[in-house]
A protein has these predicted regions:
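N-terminal active-site segment of His-dependent metallophosphoesterases
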Residues: 1-63
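A short acidic, helix-capping loop that chelates divalent metal ions and anchors anionic groups
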Residues: 13-19, 86, 124-127, 160-164, ...
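Active-site-proximal beta-strand elements of phosphoester/diester hydrolases
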Residues: 2-14, 112-122, 151-153, 206-212, ...
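Short glycine-enriched, charge-decorated loop/helix-capping segments at active-site entrances
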Residues: 18-24, 94, 124, 163-169, ...
């Protein structure tokens, strides 16, 4: 069996005392990592689905790297809308190939499964885009490897959540990936970040899920931006034979209460 740990939306600042709408994201990430260590979880792979930083500074990426040191030998990453591709690549040059602002993707295999990371980042934008090249890359990789099953990772979820303000900043070409999910039954799971809460949706034979942030939590019920005092968390994915099982783990309690966003957010 292969165990994958997914972390998302870390939103660290270079200033260790900085808060994101009242949430000390460096402290909450440390709490999440301590919870993982105390649980005895030994993941074979660790995936970060974007928003490593909030300020996109080189020194912040260095801090993220230091905090993730126990997982560096098995770390896979894609950028979010609060990432700078070149700086993320520079901070993790031993893990991320390519140069400059090129797309950041990944591919690895585990127990006959193919795991692919897609880059939905649009520089300067909050929403995301997959693009036809990445759709064809997925199709090509699946055809080449003939895996038992496929797991996709990306920052922006390729579905409408039914939460108006989050759907406005989702993937603009989500229909293209949904078509692929409908035609390729081996794609069993699409695991995403961006929306700072857990959710589950079905597209074709695939389950499309989102994961809580390691810091600030969004309300899944409000049609406009609202933050909630919920514990941070992470996702565990287990691959065994033809089975793909996934669950969210949250810390026991929320230690901080967020400040609500401005109405124009």
């Amino acid at each position: 069996m292969t165990t994958i740990l997914q972390l998302s939306d870390l939103h660290l600042f270079a200033d260790p005392d900085a808060v994101l709408f009242g949430i000390p994201t460096r402290r909450t990430l440390r709490d999440v990592l301590a919870h993982i260590e105390a649980s005895g979880l030994q993941p074979h792979h660790v995936v970060v689905t974007g928003d490593h930083t909030h300020d996109e500074l080189p020194e912040t990426y260095a801090d993220v790297r230091e905090l993730l040191t126990p997982f560096l030998d098995r770390l896979h990453q894609v950028p979010g809308n609060h990432d700078d591709r070149a700086r993320l690549r520079e901070g993790f040059s031993d893990r991320i190939g390519g140069t400059g602002a090129e797309r950041i993707t990944f591919s690895f295999e585990a127990d006959g499964w193919l795991c692919l990371g897609l880059d939905t980042h649009i520089p300067g934008e909050v929403g995301g885009r997959i693009g036809p090249e990445q759709i064809e890359w997925v199709r090509s990789r699946v055809g080449e490897r003939q895996p038992r099953g496929v797991v996709l990772f990306m920052h922006h979820p390729p579905v409408e959540l039914g939460v108006a303000w989050l759907d406005r900043i989702g993937v603009e070409d989500r229909a293209a990936l949904q078509e692929l999910l409908a035609e390729e039954p081996r794609i069993r799971l699409v695991s995403c970040g961006h929306v700072h809460h857990e959710s589950s949706h079905r597209v074709g034979g695939a389950e499309v899920v989102t994961v809580p942030s390691t810091g600030l939590q969004f309300s899944p019920l409000s049609q406009e931006a609202e933050f909630v005092a919920a514990p941070p968390g992470y996702r565990i994915i287990e691959l065994h034979g033809d089975i793909c099982a996934t669950s969210v783990v949250r810390l026991p309690e929320a230690l901080f209460t967020p400040v609500q966003p401005p109405a124009e957010l």
